[in-house]
């Protein structure tokens, strides 16, 4: 405010709100509230949450009165004022009314009795026969119109010098001419969008599953020109943000913070409107909607689904690329580059929703190299999010997009081309991967992600394994590294202790087996290294297929009281040899029945990495036992949460480097410092009690037979050729020309059901709210609209 006296007068007006009862509408206190403040910070600092809570508790009628007065004032100002001077008192008055309402609405929504009053106040049609719309509809129309008010948020247009003119703020989708840009218009748009976000926040304070009446109304406005202009304005403003120099093209650096606020609120309001599917609001709103005898629709998502010019798709892809990729290439200090790291979720949610509503955009995306850029970036970002428990939903969003891309046949086939370093990844940190295809890279990265997440985020691990199932249907020319990663994933997923630690882990094993079967059945002549590698380890697969529930439970029940061989009672995981004896005994039995000797993999002949031959008959007792311990240690080591993002280099680089080191090292993991694993937190269902009935429901459905039929026959031929001294090239030629058993139906996990799509839509909406609330918080230098209020929607998220 301009002076200490003004601040004191405003503060006294706030105190009167909870000290006096029934302040009339014509009292001068209301005028002081909208004339004295100068900035949003003044309103939020001098009208605290504690003050408003006292008003709600001691004089709720004053809170109701101020809402009514502010609504009327904003409507009157729009009708009667020209707004030809940004410094005019009327402009300041309108802005302060918006700031006050932004501050007040969360207090109204968090209280049940106040929400009931607001529902009646906003959505009950007045008894006046000349009025057929409720106050809420009129007010929301007014607020939206402020976004297109001449000389307030847009410049004069031709002969139009005042009033509302629906137009698109920024060049881009649908609109190409450039509009005059002024800083005052940007700041005013921020205030209007912030008010809309506050009005939409009703649903984050509810626990009944119903949405926001205000958001549902705005999304269902049947004015095509308004919807087109607002949707295009929000998209274009967000997509035109030039991050290359960390400032907008038309603003000096000092004003970039204000423009970044506009980007944040454009994204937030856009995502909330796009994802609006819950048309159930408060009782009075529902009555109002039913009285109109029309089914409510989300015209924003409908219009988005009809967007089809390739030029518009190109604009959106260019904008997403600017927002996602350049910050990772930036040479400026990491602390500054993290500014855009906060925006990644907003861009990815938008991408997910756009793909969800517009199939044309998705097909356009996969027809270009941008899809591979996005795919590699998502893998990279997944490792970055892996180390922080607070970014679980960020990781889940990346995995959802990965799964959607790999579910497309044409995209999976494109991954068979040779891998090239991506410009989307940091210049200073190239991926330590060469000599393979994008499919090889993807299998290695996803296998690592599954081993990192399977003990902590089973849902994410399952989705990643589903992606492997789709990819392996079309993957060709897989090299030794990816073949080995796939086998290690099978080892990790088939560990007996892991299978019985809860009631869903077996799904991960089922998906991994499905991925292997898809790879060996549908690209046999192209995947000779994969077939050779698994054939040489077919005894291990047969040993796993011979596991019995009784043997596993006997080990578990023989452990200390209250403990499991896979975890301890205090939730800490340790490496354990308890279950190794089961696999070892099964392997001995399989080897004793095997008609052919075992020949170790010769890395020099077949180009495989120098993997320790841990299953040789000569070292069956010592070697296999050692390998099981090594595999157990590796599993738990990989499951450890990695260090926070700022303390180390990119996690994808780190993970691939470690994986390559392990594959090329003769030493057992237990001979390294990494082998001395400390206890780590572990998500185990301690209430789960495995039963024979539970085991028999899923164990028979695991398709070991397809693998064993192929690998058993192939291993016999490989053994005969090795005994005859045939070179590696002839063995590989035999594998490529071999006639294999008839293929079964491919294993394709079903996920694109109506229920799954609804779950994804709900997740995207909740996540959009979570990110919006986080960006608005004080720690992100936001005004803190929702801080100090009782937000309920994230309790179970």
From Swiss-Prot:
Alphabetic keyword roster: Cytoplasm, Nucleus
InterPro entries on file: Hid-1/Ecm30
Location relative to the cell: Cytoplasm; Nucleus
Main location: cytoplasm
PANTHER family: PROTEIN HID1
Family, similarity comment: Belongs to the hid-1 family.
Protein name as annotated: Hid-1 family protein P27G11.12
Species this chain originates from: Schizosaccharomyces pombe (strain 972 / ATCC 24843) (Fission yeast)
Lineage: Eukaryota, Fungi, Dikarya, Ascomycota, Taphrinomycotina
